[in-house]
Every structure is written in structure tokens, then in C-alpha cells.
Amino acid sequence: MEQNIYFDNGSTSWPKAPGVAASMTKLLESGAFNINRGNYEGAYELENQVLKTRMQLARFFHAPDSRCVVFTPGITYSLNCLLKGFLKPGDHVLVSSLEHNAVMRPLCQLASQDIHYTMIPAETDGTTHPESLEALIRPETKAVIMLHASNVCGTILPIREIGEICRRRHLFFAVDTAQSAGSVDIDMQKCNIDFLAFTGHKGLLGPQGVGGRVGKKGQRGPRAVPPQGIGGFLISEALDQELTPLIAGGTGSQSDSLLMPDYLPDKYESGTLNLPGIIGLHAALTYLDETGISAIHQKKMALTGHFLEKIREIPQAHVVGRQTLQDRLAVVSLDFPDYDNVEIAFALEQDYGIMTRVGLHCAPMAHQTLHTMPQGTIRFAFSHFNTVEEIDQCIAGFRELFSV
């Protein structure tokens, strides 16, 4: 077997950014204190590091205020907070036909509460047309909720155009940036994003177990905004007064009151935060700032272009989604119509050390849209730490498997 090659960065990035492991180890070994509780220097220093991470994230997503960054265990948690803390009986939302189960399963749970959704249809390459959205808006429609880029085929959705429609139609706009954060610049103000959910362990190159959301301040949106997040939400003062956190508990602030604090971020951060994860994310964001997202994206897309060019030499392979680099990320799904995708993925790992993800990728609606149900696809998601040589080894493995 060849040396292991990791092409599963769509699930989680590896390796992590330099400095992530060291920063977390240092915290755990030299003073893993708690913030907003301890009245001693070590706790104050750690609180300052958490504040710096909030400021990094606010700059990263072009949010105007770091107080709107709220930490959660992950992006699935954040999206559940949005859906279950905002929507009320009789409400209706629009979602793309490429959504992850982090959105679809909560919505299906909410159907018993008379909360409904309509899918905005995408083409078979993942292309979504903003103009198709307006015809689906109903009087009871409260929000548009969609991923920024498909975790199956990598197609980027036109969130700026859709955000403008939401602004004009006074709809709440929520964006899942699980695949795009850290790969492309995301400006929540220019895109009119009211709620931006993100994860720290994929394109942001941080540790697992941290994620969050960003909501926009001063925009018309939900009657209630859900709690928790790494990332956060920004919202007008009037709207903020209507919020009721789903999670309540100790915050280390206003402890004389049995009610939750009414100010950000404390209002939505009950309990002990994942401080090692936040410190690791701080190190990852520092690396991204120093390296530059543009440079990272350019390297990843160069690798993707090389893969798309070389895979054409394997006639058994069908590229699912866009065939070029336009409007896509460094995520490529392959289908082998005459073969078992699971067996091919297994052979790649066992015989050539190539690690991918095979199956439905927790996005069955996307596979229905892309016509890859029920077999799913083999997904290749590249990092800027990957190399052209690794891709060439992968193509050589395919040639050997199919005797091309």
C-alpha cells in the first residue's frame, strides 16, 4: 500500500493548521481555567483570548460587532437552534434542493408543529437560479435557509443575489457555510445574511467540536433568534428584546437573577464553553490571516483543476456536478455507474492508501437532485496541504483498478 493520502477534507480538515495542537496542549497543561467565573489573572488572560477569537471571526465574516459571535458545539447545533428557536406553527421556509440533513431533519421534525418548507429546485449540476425563488414565496414565508456550497458536488450557490431578494421581500436569510468558510471570502453584510452558521473544523482548519452562527444587526428578520454559536448573530435592539433563549443556565454574569442576561453574547451562552476548541480555532484563524484565504483557495482550485483534467482519462468515472472550475469549491464527486462505488472507495483505501468519503454524505435530497440516488458518490475534497503528486498517485490507482 502507498503512503496514506487524505482527500476527505469535506468531512473534516487534516492536517490542521500549524499551531492548533500546540495552542490547545499549552492551555490544557498550563491553565485550562474557566472564563466569567474565576477572579484571577489566568482566567482574565483566557477571557481576553476568547474575545480576540470573537473579533477574528467578526472580521472574517465582515460582521460589524464581535459581541454577536456566539459559540456552540458545532454547525448542526447552530442550525437546530435557528430552526427550533425561530420558527413557529404556521410558518413556512424556503430551502435549496441540495441541503444537508442538518437542515432537513430538523425541518421534518418541525412538520408536526405545522411548520413547512418548499425546496428551491437546482439543476442536475447543482446550479440554483435566484429568480426561481420568488415564485415560491408565500404570505407565511419567514425565511430562506440554504447552504453556501454543496457538500456533495461543490457547486456554489448565488447567496449574494438571493440575499438581495430576501432583503427586498423582508425575509430572514440564513446561510450554512460548512463547506465554504475558509475557502472563499464571505461578507454577511454585502450578502444581506441575517444568520451565518459555520464550523471551525473544516475550511477554517481548527479542531472538531466547535462551530457557530452569525446574524446581522439592524435588518428585518426573525421574530426570534436561536441561541448558541461559534460565529454568531447580529440583530437590532428591538428584535433582540423579543428573543427567548432555548438554553438557559449559568453564564457567570448577573448571577443574582434567575433570568438569563439580556445582552450579547451572554444571553445565548449558558454553561461552560469549549475553551480548548476556541483557543485552537484562534490559532487556525491566525494561520489563515497570515497565509491568506485567496492564496489557499487558489492552491485548492489548482489541485481541483488538475484532478478534473486527469479524471477524464478514466472513462468509467463520471464527474457529478459542474465539469469546470466555475462557481465551485475544491469538492468533486465521482460516480461509477457500472460499478459499486463503495467497493471502489474501499479498494482506493486498502490498495493505495487514498482516503475519501463514499455514500450519500448526509444529503439525500442533493443526491436526488444530482441523480445519484441511491448509490451515492465517492467524494474527493482537497486541502491546500495536498499536492499534485498525490492526485497523480490517485489517478494511477484508478488506471490500475480499471486497467486503463
What is each PLM-predicted segment?
Residues 1-404:
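Pyridoxal 5′-phosphate
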